[in-house]
């Protein structure tokens, strides 16, 4: 069992990583006998995990209710979040309740925002079941729902009480979802850790095959890196946490334009990271060889390295200008400056953005 702490003073919390955690009551601390919990999950995951988690909690005397939501990015909305509030109110959950997010990034983000909002804030626990949510979205307290005009535009910074990562969940993950998660894994190597990027180049086949030791190390390293960044810049005020958004400004444009769920989040981020690499290459801070290493690693992870055929370069910018990093009308982009290093830049022209996007339309 691995334990990592996200250090935020009185709001610090543990990340627990191991197999078989759903059968261990102590996994779900700080839940205690007599306390209420509302498990939020979706129709795909409920048959797989809901009974296991419910039984483990009920054996400890926890009072368990659940709400089962539809599955998909298109349901990460205020309308669906209202179903969570309805369930909480109908079951008379009060301020000492705990929401338990049992699912991937959509469930985690939506449940976290519901927890931040219900009766002005209740406790919640992240139980991520996808690789993407285990290595990224479950850690750090970013919670949100989507709006038709932009991804994650309505939300709050709200930290969980704990994060529980059961490695056994990956055995039921569809290959496309696994690859989507690997995009966020590769991101960490590009922006923060050259040695980890090299390790990924040498071990990507093991990750695709779900080799247990490789996967455990991979998830632990990603969580360590994310925890360090969140501890130093929780609310993205210094620019450090913004580095975690490599590829996301381009990627969110793809998701919004194509319709949420058509491209998985990691797929859109993968194409976006290539666009960011091409932009950095054009600026002379990333070599062609480094760009090719990124492209080849993404391809080995079965990820796209081009934007959608249906999108033209001019389709991206309106969505990109709604990005949360836009300030004073200027687009702020996270760009690599060598494998393992990155920076946030506000001096990128529209022409340079268009050039990078154009080079990623059926080009690689």
Swiss-Prot record:
Q: Which UniProt keywords apply?
A: Amino-acid biosynthesis, Aromatic amino acid biosynthesis, Cobalt, Cytoplasm, Lyase, Metal-binding, NAD, Nucleotide-binding, Zinc
Instruction: Describe cofactor binding as the record notes it.
Output: Binds 1 divalent metal cation per subunit. Can use either Co(2+) or Zn(2+).
Entry cofactors: Co(2+); Zn(2+); NAD(+)
Catalysis performed (reactions): 7-phospho-2-dehydro-3-deoxy-D-arabino-heptonate = 3-dehydroquinate + phosphate
Q: Which domain of life is it from?
A: Bacteria
User: Where in or outside the cell?
Assistant: Cytoplasm
Q: Name the residues that bind Zn(2+).
A: 184, 248, 265
**EC number(s) per entry:** 4.2.3.4
Q: Which GO terms describe its biological process?
A: amino acid biosynthetic process; aromatic amino acid family biosynthetic process; chorismate biosynthetic process
Query: Which pathway features in its UniProt record?
Result: Metabolic intermediate biosynthesis; chorismate biosynthesis; chorismate from D-erythrose 4-phosphate and phosphoenolpyruvate: step 2/7
Tell me which family the UniProt entry assigns to this protein: Belongs to the sugar phosphate cyclases superfamily. Dehydroquinate synthase family.
The protein here is known as: 3-dehydroquinate synthase
- Give the species: Proteus mirabilis (strain HI4320)
What gene does this protein come from? aroB
């Amino acid at each position: 069992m691995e334990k990592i702490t996200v250090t935020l003073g009185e709001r610090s919390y543990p990340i627990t990583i191991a197999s078989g955690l759903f059968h261990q009551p102590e996994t779900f601390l700080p839940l205690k006998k007599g306390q209420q919990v509302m498990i939020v999950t979706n129709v795909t995951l409920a048959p797989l995990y809901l009974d296991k988690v419910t039984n483990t909690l009920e054996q400890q005397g926890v009072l368990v209710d659940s709400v089962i939501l539809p599955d998909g990015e298109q349901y990460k909305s205020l309308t669906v979040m209202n179903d969570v509030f309805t369930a909480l109110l109908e079951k008379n959950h009060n301020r000492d309740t705990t929401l338990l997010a049992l699912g991937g990034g959509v469930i985690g983000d939506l449940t976290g925002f519901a927890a931040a909002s219900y009766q002005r804030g209740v406790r919640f626990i992240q139980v991520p079941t996808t690789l993407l949510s285990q290595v990224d979205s479950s850690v750090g307290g970013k919670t949100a729902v989507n709006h038709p005009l932009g991804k994650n535009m309505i939300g709050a910074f709200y930290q969980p009480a704990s994060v529980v990562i059961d490695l056994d969940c990956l055995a039921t993950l569809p290959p496309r979802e696994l690859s989507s998660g690997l995009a966020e894994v590769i991101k960490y190597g590009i922006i923060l850790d050259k040695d980890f990027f090299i390790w990924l180049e040498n071990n990507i086949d093991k990750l695709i095959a779900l080799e247990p030791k490789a996967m455990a190390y991979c998830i632990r390293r990603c969580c360590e890196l994310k925890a360090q960044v969140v501890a130093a810049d929780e609310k993205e005020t210094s620019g450090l946490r913004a580095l975690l958004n490599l590829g996301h400004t381009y990627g969110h444009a793809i998701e919004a334009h194509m319709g949420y769920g058509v491209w998985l989040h990691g797929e859109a981020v993968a194409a976006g990271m290539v666009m960011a690499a091409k932009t950095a290459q054009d600026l002379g801070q990333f070599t062609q060889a480094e760009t090719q290493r990124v492209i080849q690693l993404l391809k080995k992870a079965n990820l796209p390295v081009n934007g959608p055929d249906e999108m033209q370069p001019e389709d991206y910018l309106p969505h990109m200008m709604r990005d949360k990093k836009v300030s004073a009308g200027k687009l702020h982009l996270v760009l690599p400056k060598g494998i393992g290093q990155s920076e946030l830049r506000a001096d990128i022209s529209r022409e340079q953005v268009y050039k990078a996007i154009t080079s990623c339309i059926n080009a690689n």
